């Protein structure tokens, strides 16, 4: 077991790649470390895979082991379970730049498993996992057109930061991950604090330039490993079948792709496909229906792309820069705290906003440390939105990814907890889909939040851009349809305000996307975004002045920190009874800030008065109306404030000499008492006699 090791300096970090010791039965395996964050990636590919498929079965699994952070998992079973949301998102992050680098005809099964085995809380493992995956695929011998590099880019005070630490990211205006080969950007994922198009494009170019050290180092590493390449070749193209299909279907496809209605268009294409298959199979028994279907799909792609490059109208009749018809409605659901129905062409999102207390915040316990999330955005894509039947259950990877993208788009305009002390949950139900449903969710979320009375810094809109490129000719498309996304060369989603970008996601399927093309796409996206924002502002010019009558209103008071235990009580008994009796939710922070959430002013006032009574200080010389709670031979104990009793000595009951306390006082009797003294131990001396004298004098 002789390891092959390659180390290189990457910005402020040292990266080490190692293979040859672990997982030697896998096709390839690499341990990648970056300043104590270590990710182990295994790749297994089936070389002699003869199974007939019409897709590439690439699976990427990313898992974080708690032992990496020196922790034992919580829960009953004390072991890692289903992937967390962050693990799912990082798996998608690895998959997206890797998938387009396998050749079109490659259908062999490939599985990538990335395992975080050691974590430095300051070094994010996602970039490390992507570098390790690139290295493992590059030494696997599979027909992988890599390697890829990866970089995280921050932006602070006009300077770009390469692979900023967790602490540096907290004050950065940008969190962008970019991945690509030596000559092409393939994937961008980012959230930003309302930055200009030029700054965002500069970040992409900066990250791609800086990651070239990774690409070159992996090439050197792969050359040292020197694993033989697979003996794989793409299936030969049946030119006679291509010609026959073009004769039978091309003109009909050109007609079908002028039908603007999605359902009618799909019906027409389905009919053409079925008829051509039937005719060709009848004329040549050696042909297979599956092969004919693949060739028909390729012809569809050619037809759509050729029309766009020639400057002909798009599938639905629009020109490249046009946006589909918009319909914006707010307050569509009577009992939700905020709601909106956003429709763009045949894409529609019903979005709701719900306000809760800080107790409703999501606690995320990851190997990077525990954190609270006070803003949740969930995206649901039911099968009916595309006119299909299907399983309805827990969210799939795509739904988790689209939800996080929409959240990134809105996050920059959300108020701070100090400005708006609520936990906010937004849910986007996609009710119709024909392209760009995640960006419809951004628009709907902005509207629903404003409808709920959340004081956003600005309205946010999102738009999906596409690209068709043939040789040196290219056309950038605004507001792409599902078919244009599927048949095009780029999916480019931008969310932002009138002032700048809040989120950018880019997936590129081809090489040769220049800075010029990205600049044109960003500028075209800005024009589209401003158009959508204008329509949104006409429907709801500004947020509601007040929150919904059905939302909890949060009232804040301050108490002495020494009194916190009095409000909470033994085992939480006092605060629990307060919540139950007043119908409120009460939260107490360590600095004595008390937040009372109630749906009515009466409930809030009741809770506030009770808390004030519980925390009130006993003042010497003040007269209180109290209740006798216990009699003793030497006097009576009187409750003057919640949880605070004082002693009326037998000599302080009245002017006459008292022989027996019970002759003058009964348990439960209300009496007026004057506070004579509070000693160092907090014991209170009371007097009924002096209270009576003072009352008489007044």
Swiss-Prot record:
InterPro entries assigned: ExoRNase_PH_dom1, ExoRNase_PH_dom2, ExoRNase_PH_dom2_sf, KH_dom, KH_dom_type_1, KH_dom_type_1_sf, NA-bd_OB-fold, PNPase
Catalysed reactions listed for this entry: RNA(n+1) + phosphate = RNA(n) + a ribonucleoside 5'-diphosphate
Main location: cytoplasm
EC number(s) on file: 2.7.7.8
One protein family per Pfam: RNase_PH_C
One cellular component (GO) term of this entry: cytosol
Localization in the cell: Cytoplasm
Annotated S1 motif domain residues: 621-689
Quaternary data: Component of the RNA degradosome, which is a multiprotein complex involved in RNA processing and mRNA degradation.
PANTHER family the record matches: POLYRIBONUCLEOTIDE NUCLEOTIDYLTRANSFERASE, POLYRIBONUCLEOTIDE NUCLEOTIDYLTRANSFERASE 1, MITOCHONDRIAL
Function summary: Involved in mRNA degradation. Catalyzes the phosphorolysis of single-stranded polyribonucleotides processively in the 3'- to 5'-direction.
Name of the protein in question: Polyribonucleotide nucleotidyltransferase
């Amino acid at each position: 077991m002789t390891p092959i090791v390659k180390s290189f300096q990457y910005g402020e970090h040292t990266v080490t790649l190692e293979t040859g010791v672990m997982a030697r039965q896998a096709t390839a395996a690499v341990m990648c470390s970056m300043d104590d964050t270590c990710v182990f990636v295994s790749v297994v590919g089936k070389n002699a895979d003869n199974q007939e498929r019409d897709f590439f079965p690439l699976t990427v699994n990313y898992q974080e082991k708690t032992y990496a952070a020196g922790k034992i998992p919580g829960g009953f079973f004390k072991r890692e379970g289903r992937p967390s949301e962050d693990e799912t998102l990082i798996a998608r992050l690895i998959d997206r730049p890797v998938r387009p680098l396998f050749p079109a005809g490659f259908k062999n099964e490939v599985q990538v498993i990335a395992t975080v085995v050691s974590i430095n809380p300051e070094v994010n493992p996602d970039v490390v996992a992507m570098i390790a995956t690139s290295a493992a695929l590059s030494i696997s011998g599979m027909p992988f057109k890599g390697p890829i590099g990866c970089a995280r880019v921050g932006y602070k005070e006009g300077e770009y930061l390469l692979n900023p630490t967790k602490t540096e990211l907290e004050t950065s205006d940008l969190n962008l991950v970019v991945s690509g080969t030596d000559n092409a950007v393939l994937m961008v994922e980012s959230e930003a604090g309302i930055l200009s198009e030029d700054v965002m494009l500069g970040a992409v170019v900066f990250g791609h330039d800086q990651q070239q050290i990774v690409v070159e180092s992996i090439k050197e590493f792969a050359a040292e490993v020197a694993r033989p390449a697979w003996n794989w070749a793409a299936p030969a193209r049946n030119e006679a079948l291509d010609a026959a299909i073009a004769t039978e279907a091309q003109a009909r496809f050109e007609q079908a792709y002028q039908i603007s209605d999605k359902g009618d268009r799909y019906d027409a294409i389905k009919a053409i496909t079925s008829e051509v298959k039937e005719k060709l199979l009848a004329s040549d028994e050696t042909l297979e229906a599956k092969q004919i279907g693949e060739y028909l799909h390729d012809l569809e792609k050619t037809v759509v792309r050729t029309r766009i490059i020639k400057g002909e109208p798009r599938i639905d009749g629009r020109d490249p820069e046009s946006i589909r018809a918009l319909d914006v409605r707010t307050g569509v659901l009577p009992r939700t705290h905020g709601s909106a129905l956003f429709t763009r062409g045949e894409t529609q999102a019903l979005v709701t906003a719900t306000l809760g207390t800080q107790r409703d915040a999501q606690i995320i316990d990851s190997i990077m440390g525990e954190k609270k999330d006070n803003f949740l955005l969930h995206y649901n894509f039911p099968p009916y939105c595309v006119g299909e039947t299907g399983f309805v259950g827990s969210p799939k990877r795509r739904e988790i990814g689209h939800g996080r993208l929409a959240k990134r788009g809105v996050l920059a305009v959300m108020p701070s907890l100090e400005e708006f002390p609520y936990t906010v949950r937004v849910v986007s139900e996609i009710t119709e889909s024909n392209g760009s449903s995640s960006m419809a969710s951004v628009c709907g979320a902005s509207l629903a939040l404003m409808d709920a009375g959340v004081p956003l810094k600005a309205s946010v809109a999102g738009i999906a851009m596409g690209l068709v490129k043939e040789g040196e000719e290219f056309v950038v498309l605004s507001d792409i349809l599902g078919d244009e996304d599927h048949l095009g060369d780029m999916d480019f989603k931008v969310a932002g305000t009138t002032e700048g970008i809040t989120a950018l996601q880019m997936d590129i399927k081809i090489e040769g996307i220049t800075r010029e093309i990205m600049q044109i796409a960003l500028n075209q996206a800005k024009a589209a975004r401003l158009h959508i924002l204008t329509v949104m502002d006409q429907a709801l010019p500004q947020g509601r002045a007040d929150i919904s009558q059905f939302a909890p209103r949060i009232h804040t008071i301050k108490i002495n920190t020494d009194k916190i235990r009095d409000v909470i009580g033994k085992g939480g008994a006092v605060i629990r009874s307060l919540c139950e009796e007043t119908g409120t939710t009460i939260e107490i922070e360590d600095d004595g800030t008390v937040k009372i959430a109630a749906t009515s002013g009466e409930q809030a006032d009741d809770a506030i008065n009770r808390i004030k009574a519980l925390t009130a200080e006993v003042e010497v010389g003040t007269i209180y109306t109290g209740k006798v709670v216990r009699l003793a031979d030497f006097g009576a104990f009187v409750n003057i404030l919640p949880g605070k009793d004082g002693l009326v000595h037998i000599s302080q009951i009245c002017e006459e000499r008292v022989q027996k306390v019970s002759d003058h006082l009964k348990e439960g009797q209300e009496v007026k008492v004057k506070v004579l003294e509070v000693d160092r131990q907090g014991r209170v001396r009371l007097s009924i006699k002096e209270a009576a004298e003072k009352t008489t004098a007044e």
